[in-house]
Amino acid sequence: VKATGGTTVYFAGVTAAPPYHYHPHRPEEFDTLPRDLPAQTRMALENLKKSLEAVGGTVEDVVFLQTFMTTMEGHGQAGAVRREFLGEHRPATTTMQVVRLATDPRCLIEVNAIAVVG
């Protein structure tokens, strides 16, 4: 993926959790998380979309998408959610399975993204 012009914006630690939460994390903030990977994927990508919009960007501005998952159960369905989110847009992507995310043990997915806006 080659991007020219615009402003590079980095997004890190995007999960299905509420975008504004306490640090250090409070367990009760994660009580409403769905327990399946596809649903958390949808919520995390919606949070990413809101963050993109906050800086004047869109999904089409994403040039790199990095995904960490704590389970591969539901991976195919999560991939379908990602394809729905991206539409015809194809940024560079990578997906890795990890033992646990630092946010909360109930978080199953975390996304980092790089976008070139403008």
Stretches with model-predicted labels:
Residues 1-118:
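Short, polar/acidic, helix-capping and beta-turn segments at strand->helix junctions
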